[in-house]
């Protein structure tokens, strides 16, 4: 009668049974090379584009991607805009200089300038205080509330003028310098009769500052150009 089965089938009564030899059908173990030569690297190099990328700042972090810089483009646009503004300002200045005399020629021509200066000199000769004050205030006459000091100055100016001349007549406008469309400086010649007596003199020059306002030409100031005693 056979005895109980052994828990280890490999162990019998006659000793341990040998392990079966591997058959030819079983896969053989792969032998890895223990020494890799320098001619054959263990891993093939990556694409050429990977070499151009900058190294990562930290391990495991992908390299930074380089974006195209727009600084050069913005600088070029700024230069173009600045040149355009300078060109526009230059053209405006040149246009204003060229058209200044043309726009003011009708207002400050010799005729209106001569009439305004003659009227102011007549006011000094005749002691017309209101006309002297209106011209001397140079456009702000209507806004000034107290004109007593201006009237006193007008009387003094008239007295000084009458001590020099008994009669004055503007004979020519020698030069007009335009400051703007509404302002001009005028050099003129007048024939004067000295208050002390004597023959008239016709080569006396004066300078007047004119202002055009509300259709009127005002003589803001008057200076005798020729020195001498009358």
Curated annotation (Swiss-Prot):
One of its GO terms (cellular component) is extracellular region. The lineage of its organism: Bacteria, Bacillati, Actinomycetota, Actinomycetes, Mycobacteriales. The keyword Transmembrane applies. Residues 38-55 have a biased composition (Low complexity). It is a single-pass membrane protein. The chain crosses the membrane at residues 75-95. This is Uncharacterized protein Rv2203. It comes from the Bacteria. Keywords: Membrane, Transmembrane, Transmembrane helix. The keyword Membrane applies. Disulfide bonds: none annotated. Residues 1-57 are annotated as: Disordered. It is found in: Membrane. Its main location: membrane.
């Amino acid at each position: 009668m056979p005895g109980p089965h052994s828990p280890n089938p490999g162990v019998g009564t006659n000793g341990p049974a040998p392990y079966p030899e591997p058959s030819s059908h079983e896969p053989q173990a792969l032998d890895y090379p223990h020494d890799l030569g320098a001619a054959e690297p263990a891993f093939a190099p990556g694409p050429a584009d990977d070499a151009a990328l900058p190294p990562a700042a930290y391990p495991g972090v992908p390299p930074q991607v380089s974006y195209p810089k727009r600084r050069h483009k913005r600088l070029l646009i700024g230069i173009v805009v600045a040149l355009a503004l300078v060109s526009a300002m230059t053209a405006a200045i040149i246009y204003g200089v060229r058209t200044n005399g043309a726009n003011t020629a009708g207002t400050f021509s010799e005729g209106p300038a001569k009439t305004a200066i003659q009227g102011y000199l007549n006011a000094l000769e005749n002691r017309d205080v209101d006309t002297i004050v209106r011209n001397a205030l140079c456009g702000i006459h209507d806004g000034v509330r107290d004109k007593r000091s201006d009237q006193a100055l007008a009387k003094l100016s008239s007295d000084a003028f009458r001590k020099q001349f008994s009669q004055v007549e503007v004979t020519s406008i020698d030069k007009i310098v335009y400051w703007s469309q509404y302002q001009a400086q005028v050099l003129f010649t007048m024939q004067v009769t000295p208050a002390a007596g004597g023959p008239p003199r016709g080569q006396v020059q004066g300078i007047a500052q004119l202002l055009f306002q509300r259709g009127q030409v005002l003589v803001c100031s008057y200076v005798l150009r020729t020195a001498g005693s009358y």
